[in-house]
C-alpha cells in the first residue's frame, strides 16, 4: 500500500481510483492530478515508483487542500457562519437541513430519531 500524505491508498486498484480514497479528491481532481504529473491513470497504485510517490506528495501538499486541512477548513467555515448568526449557521446549530429542503416531513437524517408527542385531546 503506497502512503500518500499520510494515507494508505489501495495498492491493487487503478491509480485514478486509489487517489479518490484521500479526503478532498474526487474522480475529476484525481484525473487532473494524474495529468499534471504525467502518470498512467490505468496503472495500479502498487506500480508507482518512490520518485512518483514523492512527486505526488509534493504536489498535494503544495497545491491542494486535502485531508486534515480541508476538514479543519470546513469546520471553521461552519463555526464562522454560526458566530456571525447567518441563516445557514443557525440551521447548522439547530441540526436542520441547511440548503432549503422541506422539514414538515422528511429530513430524518438531520433531525434524528422521531420524538413522540402526545396526540390532540378530543
UniProtKB/Swiss-Prot annotation:
GO cellular component terms, semicolon-separated: cytosol; small ribosomal subunit
Q: Which InterPro entries match?
A: Rbsml_uS13_C (IPR027437), Ribosomal_uS13 (IPR001892), Ribosomal_uS13-like_H2TH (IPR010979), Ribosomal_uS13_bac-type (IPR019980), Ribosomal_uS13_CS (IPR018269)
Pfam families (UniProt xref): Ribosomal_S13
The protein's UniProt keywords, in alphabetical order, are:
Ribonucleoprotein, Ribosomal protein, RNA-binding, rRNA-binding, tRNA-binding
According to the record, the residues making up region (Disordered) are 96-122
UniProt keyword rRNA-binding present:
yes
Q: Which GO terms describe its biological process?
A: translation
Oligomeric and partner information: Part of the 30S ribosomal subunit. Forms a loose heterodimer with protein S19. Forms two bridges to the 50S subunit in the 70S ribosome.
The family note in this entry says:
Belongs to the universal ribosomal protein uS13 family.
Main function: Located at the top of the head of the 30S subunit, it contacts several helices of the 16S rRNA. In the 70S ribosome it contacts the 23S rRNA (bridge B1a) and protein L5 of the 50S subunit (bridge B1b), connecting the 2 subunits; these bridges are implicated in subunit movement. Contacts the tRNAs in the A and P-sites.
* UniProt protein name: Small ribosomal subunit protein uS13
Q: Which organism is it from?
A: Chlamydia trachomatis serovar L2 (strain ATCC VR-902B / DSM 19102 / 434/Bu)
Specify the taxonomic lineage.
Bacteria, Pseudomonadati, Chlamydiota, Chlamydiia, Chlamydiales
The gene designation is rpsM
Amino acid at each position: 500500500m503506497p502512503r500518500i500524505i499520510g494515507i494508505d491508498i489501495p495498492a491493487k486498484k487503478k491509480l485514478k481510483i486509489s487517489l479518490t480514497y484521500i479526503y478532498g479528491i474526487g474522480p475529476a481532481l484525481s484525473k487532473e492530478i494524474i495529468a499534471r504529473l504525467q502518470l498512467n491513470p490505468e496503472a495500479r497504485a502498487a506500480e508507482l515508483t518512490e520518485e512518483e510517490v514523492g512527486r505526488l506528495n509534493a504536489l498535494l501538499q503544495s497545491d491542494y487542500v486535502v485531508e486534515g486541512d480541508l476538514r479543519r477548513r470546513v469546520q471553521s467555515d461552519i463555526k464562522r457562519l454560526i458566530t456571525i448568526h447567518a441563516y445557514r449557521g443557525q440551521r447548522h446549530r439547530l441540526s436542520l437541513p441547511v440548503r432549503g429542503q422541506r422539514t414538515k416531513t422528511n429530513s430524518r437524517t438531520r433531525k434524528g430519531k422521531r420524538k413522540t408527542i402526545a396526540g390532540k385531546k378530543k
